[in-house]
């Protein structure tokens, strides 16, 4: 018998407060040092457990993604396979975050799926076990599963909890799709930033090693960042295209948003060192 719908599981966006590329490994992946922080803007997912093993996804996204490529369904299937759970789930995604903008929305959706279904299926895997499943699907997924702001190293899987200031951000989503794979394959991408200790990294100005390359290739990103820099310290998150400015108060961030040119899209968000997903998980 199908159960009631379990509602309002958040999948928050993340920002890379800094992103340094330290080298390329023999397997083609890049060694990184980055600082992840969540924000309070989220996709929302609902789940209903079913007796049969089918996995069904309903989404508000206009773009159709093949089931085999959809991270939410791949995450649910991976949890089934890892645990031997013989039921399934019906899943509803309310997609609110920009896609492909460096905010981690797809990875966050997959992480929320793993965490929520682990609870609802009563499969009782630890966060570390869920993160190991998630890492096979995407390097950003473990940080969303663990749910704390983190200094990440390696390909992004080695995490250390940190507590950066929970500032207010104005995030602008330029009308551009930046391919993460293309950025990391570009010969002009800096790959030799020295590895530094966390205390040193936290005390120096923060930067994104991908930013100069992306700005040079995407005029929309350059325009958004140039506008935002007039109001606040600003930089790109991930490989873009989204950029963010830092404000000490919501009022300041909203005042800047009110001046946003009509051809740009943006939103104000609060930095969070504990993910809204963890808050939801701790509810009955």
From Swiss-Prot:
The keyword NADP does not apply. GO terms for molecular function: 4-(cytidine 5'-diphospho)-2-C-methyl-D-erythritol kinase activity; ATP binding. Signal peptide: none annotated. InterPro entries: GHMP_kinase_C_dom, GHMP_kinase_C_sf, GHMP_kinase_N_dom, IspE, Ribosomal_Su5_D2-typ_SF, Ribsml_uS5_D2-typ_fold_subgr. Its EC number is 2.7.1.148. Keywords: ATP-binding, Isoprene biosynthesis, Kinase, Nucleotide-binding, Transferase. It comes from the Bacteria. Disulfide bonds: none annotated. Pathway: Isoprenoid biosynthesis; isopentenyl diphosphate biosynthesis via DXP pathway; isopentenyl diphosphate from 1-deoxy-D-xylulose 5-phosphate: step 3/6. SUPFAM superfamilies: GHMP Kinase, C-terminal domain, Ribosomal protein S5 domain 2-like. GO terms for biological process: isopentenyl diphosphate biosynthetic process, methylerythritol 4-phosphate pathway; terpenoid biosynthetic process. ATP binds at residues 98-108. The active site is at residues 14, 140. It catalyses: 4-CDP-2-C-methyl-D-erythritol + ATP = 4-CDP-2-C-methyl-D-erythritol 2-phosphate + ADP + H(+). Belongs to the GHMP kinase family. IspE subfamily. Catalyzes the phosphorylation of the position 2 hydroxy group of 4-diphosphocytidyl-2C-methyl-D-erythritol. This is 4-diphosphocytidyl-2-C-methyl-D-erythritol kinase. It comes from Shewanella oneidensis (strain ATCC 700550 / JCM 31522 / CIP 106686 / LMG 19005 / NCIMB 14063 / MR-1).
């Amino acid at each position: 018998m199908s159960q009631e719908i379990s509602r309002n599981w958040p999948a928050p966006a993340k920002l890379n407060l800094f992103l340094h590329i330290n080298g390329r490994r023999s397997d083609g992946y890049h060694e990184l040092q980055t600082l992840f922080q969540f924000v309070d803007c989220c996709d929302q997912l609902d789940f209903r457990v079913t007796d049969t093993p089918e996995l069904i996804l309903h989404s508000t996204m206009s773009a159709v993604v093949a089931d085999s490529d959809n991270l939410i369904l791949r995450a649910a299937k991976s949890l089934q396979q890892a645990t031997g759970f013989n039921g399934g789930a019906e899943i509803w995604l309310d997609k609110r975050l920009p896609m492909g903008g460096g905010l981690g929305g797809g990875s966050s959706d997959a992480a929320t799926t793993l965490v929520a279904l682990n609870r609802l299926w009563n499969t009782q895997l630890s966060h570390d076990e869920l993160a190991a499943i998630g890492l096979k699907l995407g390097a950003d997924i473990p940080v969303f599963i663990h749910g704390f702001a983190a200094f990440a190293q390696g390909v992004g899987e080695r995490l250390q909890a940190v507590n950066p200031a929970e500032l207010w951000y104005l995030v602008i989503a330029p009308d551009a799709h930046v391919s993460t794979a293309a950025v990391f394959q570009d010969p002009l991408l800096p790959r030799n930033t020295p590895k530094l200790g966390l205390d040193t990294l936290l005390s120096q100005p923060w930067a994104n090693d991908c930013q100069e390359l992306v700005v040079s290739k995407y005029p929309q990103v350059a325009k958004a960042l140039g506008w935002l820099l007039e109001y606040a310290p600003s930089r790109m998150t991930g490989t873009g295209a989204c950029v963010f400015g830092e404000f000490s108060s919501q009022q300041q961030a909203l005042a800047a948003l009110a001046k946003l040119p009509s051809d740009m899209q943006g939103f104000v968000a609060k930095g969070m060192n504990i993910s809204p997903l963890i808050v939801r998980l701790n509810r009955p």
